[in-house]
């Protein structure tokens, strides 16, 4: 029963898979090639296994603080790299844009480390939490959270990070590590850059997965409300921008960055949220809402006609 007393019945749920072939010029067609998987599984990911690069021959010169840092590296060495690799694979399944953005961020952070090593500057290491690894970045860091910052020189990003040190950053002198750390960083960076060069610049017009979503919204369900779930805010924001650019009206995205995602739920589903709308106020209604799991629990979205899981990891039970 709705808040106004009107009764309703839930429609029968019909799961319809949406298959699409990759267009010949779609960069995603190259991303699902074995070459991509070989690089992902072949990367050393040294920033997430720093314990293996500690120069233990110099242990007698370590300060008490450095001994504690090394102990932390040793405790964290087992799972961090595996989580990062898994996250990259999940981003690949989400879409080419999110995947290439993660690769670019990874390169940028490697370059920041290399800049520090080559200039004898302290390395910004941090606490790695599972929640960070499963979020939009392989590690949530202020240096390259903003997509625009990816084009900054490593020296600029290093200076910005040094001037605004997050609480989770621990600065470590480069002499604490062996030369192999630099070699591994260079090897991973070169391998990723080769992939990015192969893919070329991301072009929305060649994104066949996006094209299939547009077809579903415009042709298959032109008059229906469409709710799209994705695990990543990068994908959500990308899709919202691409749909608007294509000319689809009344589109928005809800992510963890929104201060009040409930307002987006109300705009998308005003009928089922009528009790939350002040008397006499109108609602700028949405037809298409793209959301991360920020709206997966505790929100009324019953005005939706079509629910799309853009990437597989979304949990239907939520």
Can you say where each PLM-predicted feature lies in the sequence?
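Helicase motor interdomain insertion/brace
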Residues: 1-259, 294
